[in-house]
Amino acid sequence: MELFQAKDHYILQSGDNALWCSRKDGSMAVRPATDLLLAWNPVCLGLVEGIIGKMQLHVDLPLGLILIRQKALVGQLPGDHKVYKITKIVVIPLSEDEPQDLELELCKKHHFGINKPERITQSPDETKFLMKTLSQIKSNVGAPIKKKVKENKEKERLERRLLDELYKIFMDSDSFYYSLTYDLTNTVQRQGELGKSDQPLWKRVDDRFFWNKHMIKDLVDLQAPQVDFWVIPIIQGFVQVEELVVNYNESSDEERSSPETPLQEPTCVDDIHPRFTVALISRRSRHRAGMRYKRRGVDTDGHVANYVETEQLIHVHSHTLSFVQTRGSVPVFWSQAGYRYNPRPRIEKGERETMPYFASHFEKEVETYKKLVIINLVDQNGREKIIGDAYLKQVLLYNNPNLTYVSFDFHEHCRGMKFENVQTLTDAIYDIITDMRWAWVDQAGVICQQEGIFRVNCMDCLDRTNVVQAAIARVIMEQQLKKLGVMPPEQPLPLKCYRIYQVMWANNGDTISRQYAGTAALKGDFTRTGERKLAGVMKDGVNSANRYYLNRFRDAYRQAVIDLMMGHPVTEDLYSIFSKEKEHEEKEKESQRGAQEQVSLLLQTYMQLLLPDDEKFHGGWALIDCDPSLIDATHKDVDVLLLLSNSAYYVAYYDEEADKVNQYQRLSLEGLEKIEIGPEPTLFGKPKYCCMRLHYKNGETSGYFHTLRSVTRNPEDDGKDTLQCIAEMLRITKQAMGLDVQVVEKKLERRHSKPHEDIMGIQGKAVDQVLGSGLAQGKSFFLNKFSTLNQKVKQTKTNVNIGNFKPLGKLGTFSKPEVKVNFLKPNLHMNLWKSDSSLETHDSNTGSGALKDHGPHSEEISSDSDSYNSDEQPCSGSRENVDYVLPSCGIVASAPRLGSRSQSIGSVEIAVPSVIRVTGCDEKTMDSLSVAADQSPGAASEAEEAILIDFGTPIDVYCHQFVQDAKTKPIEVFEEVAPAPKPQGPQVPLAPDAKLGSSHSQNQLPRPSQLEVESNVHGANLLTVQPVGSATSCGSQKSLEGITGPSSADSNGSRVVSPFAKIRSSMVQVASLTQAGLTQGINFAVAKVQKSPEPDAVNETQENELRAMFTQCQTRIIQI
């Protein structure tokens, strides 16, 4: 269609249809094409593909007419319906000002032989004269004009920023699609239910996905029959169409694995091998649309953020089969302040206040899809747990039999990029997948319908969700193809088809992610193991200040544009963002200083842990190991700490997922052969970084080296200066030993090092050597948690944001405790900052696991072959001014003083339980479950000395832990939460199918796959805590020795347990002991650290209510 510019109107004309849009007030009118003769001096500007609508970017700016400037054919859906992607748009201001260069394709009819369109514009001489006149006027009234010019500049700047974001939304993310003949907003099943209709396409669309509804509103309101030609429904989402051939003999190397590859006609039609068309259509809801950290959870209309309906179409001959899934944010009121890496989620409203809006959301879903299977992929421990718990609680309160709730901790099952473990989920719910079926239509009509949908979510509803949806859709597709006879019954999908299918879903995930989380420029930072994230200071040099800028400023503009597109008021003052941007520079400097301090603290900690007493510390650096031998399909640069002593250097490898150093290598300086510095080895392109290669000998064998590069904050800095300084220090240190090392600057060769043989794992010591010490070892605790260091940073550096420094900066993140015993080396020296405040405890009944004062130079933990050596200061005999190490609950109960960070004490008394035992509760020891009601907090140490864990069945622990979690209110201190009160007798009944036998005779407790609880069973055994006196009264019990070792299933990360309890090998380990509140003493210790009040009494009414919810719930609750 042609675009004309007249004096008062812009005119779109296609055949006999013409649309007039006023340049004064933006009003629209549909007129005959012959009325073009009535326009004043119309000039053809070029060709356009259609109209999206009009919108006003700001009250100070004119309306803009948004037109489709360029489109691209995506493919053809069944019925030869062509689908197009909008690749370029043009925005024309509806004002009397002349439009700038629109770069439209020229109309051959009106621009024959003309390269550029003519314009209604003034001559150059007239323009010069007017400019001269204006300059004279400005000089005469300079003072008033200056202020107005400044305002105009700000207005122009704001217009440029908003216009730039509008162009990026449409052009950078491949997000908007349309079809002139097919309803992209409705699924095949909904179209079949609507039946054939003579109504125009835009009147049959699903209102949720009609993205330009508000922008085209003025045109629709004309209510003229001629309007139907101009209204084009547009969806935001993703569409890809591919034709696949089921050929088991064909090589997969020639597959077309990229959507950018142009469509090609098959050169040879082979009738032997069946063909089918697969299409993927994702539709994003226009309700609660926006960016990730601007739009979370549910709103007051029951709409959720990032709601996307994804339909997979299979077309064979005349048969079309459809399978639909949805994704959407957790429908509770929650938010994340996206101004730092991995911000902590926060619940905005209470559960009672949330209930009506949660119900409103699912009522609409049930009305549309009949039945829903919720698959919740959020982490069931750590930061995300608060969201998962709130979700489950709302499901119980809603109590709808049309819902099924499935909980699957994706990160635990698929740790280490083991995506094949998603099959654990699909196998567990295979019957549900089969019962859900799919929609099936042919030329005669509807054959069958899909009964329900899967509603999948993680925190962002991005990558985890996409992986799981692709896995479920693949199961359905194979069932469909086998049903149609396209695939043999016992054969999997051919490799070539599967690869193309994988790429389609990967493209879908990338596109949805760019729409919700950012632009395509950040695609390199997108990982398939979890939600989208920046690699942080230690990865690609992208510091937290850039992350802050990205979310704070860019997202503010983009969110404003999206709100304007949807017709929502802009809540943020866009002019105020200009002044906030100036603050960004100060924030950036402050963030850099904070990151440097955190690196220094981390190096100091590992210097104390790794270096023995007879070595002197000479320097430490945070570097990146970029050894080419590590590069593969899943390659990531590995963060390392390089520590230098007077006789050796240490390379400590930091595990990003475990948030700790899990391996290290000690290399003698005598074996350091040479140091090479030069550009990194690359296959293509110019090297981006400078690297340092440290060659060393292993015994008498050469060929070993580490390739390291520095962390650069400036993109123009290759880090060479830092590496040269490190090399010089290594050379000087070796010269002090009477030896020398050669430093060479050259281009590094792309070759592999021999496998390093001296790497020491932190889990290197046998489990049987810890023989019931009662704790997960203080050494492992200090290595994993850095709790004392965190307390010191918290007290002395309040302006340091620990969460920003990723991955090495996660000092404040308490990860889920594992049933592992980690050892660094036999003799470990630890320095703890001395507390100014003490924990009031009783000195009596100190267990055998407590530290004893053996003199001024050593302390020893009994029942442990490993010893702890302190500095040369004697231990005080009292329990004042000490740090209590409680690894059993993953905390340090300490109150570091605000003095100098360098002040430390050499010896520490650690009040630890002597024994942690597991029993089956078959003995009647319920009378010793709790401490006397009048016991003061100071008397809590009796329960710390020996802890006896009693439980009945997995169902008991599952329900009991949920009761405890429901009463626990999180506190924003390093991921710790306020402890729950101690259990008060039997509170949760047994499952009807639970076995009541003694756990001594059980080899393995079954893991509950479905929560079905009845209230008529009495005498249930619970997770209980016994005081010291009862610890020795039980029958033969196993010590910690039997439960601390990781099982074979743990080693590959493929086995995951309940979100509230770990059920493994005759024991149940509560996933978060800080929340279990095992003893009042631990409660008091946690409260002391967090400066929180002591826990209140048990709310029996709330507990009974929660128990009734479990027993009466009509929703299936499944834990995988």
Curated annotation (Swiss-Prot):
GO biological process, one term: regulation of endocytic recycling
Reactions catalysed, as given in the entry: a myo-inositol phosphate + H2O = myo-inositol + phosphate
Annotated region (Disordered), positions in chain: 837-881, 979-1008
Function comment: Inositol 4-phosphatase which mainly acts on phosphatidylinositol 4-phosphate. May be functionally linked to OCRL, which converts phosphatidylinositol 4,5-bisphosphate to phosphatidylinositol, for a sequential dephosphorylation of phosphatidylinositol 4,5-bisphosphate at the 5 and 4 position of inositol, thus playing an important role in the endocytic recycling.
Keywords on record: Coated pit, Endosome, Hydrolase, Membrane
InterPro entries (alphabetical): hSac2, Inositol_phosphatase, SAC_dom
Record organism: Danio rerio
Compositional bias annotation for Polar residues: 864-879, 998-1007
EC number annotated for this UniProt entry: 3.1.3.25
GO molecular function, one term: protein homodimerization activity
Highest taxon of the lineage: Eukaryota
Annotated ranges, domain hSac2: 593-760
Pfam families: hSac2 (PF12456), Syja_N (PF02383)
Basic and acidic residues compositional bias, start-end: 851-860
Gene: inpp5f
Subcellular location per the Swiss-Prot or TrEMBL entry: Membrane, Clathrin-coated pit; Early endosome; Recycling endosome
Domain SAC: 167-518
Protein name as catalogued: Phosphatidylinositide phosphatase SAC2
GO cellular component, one term: clathrin-coated pit
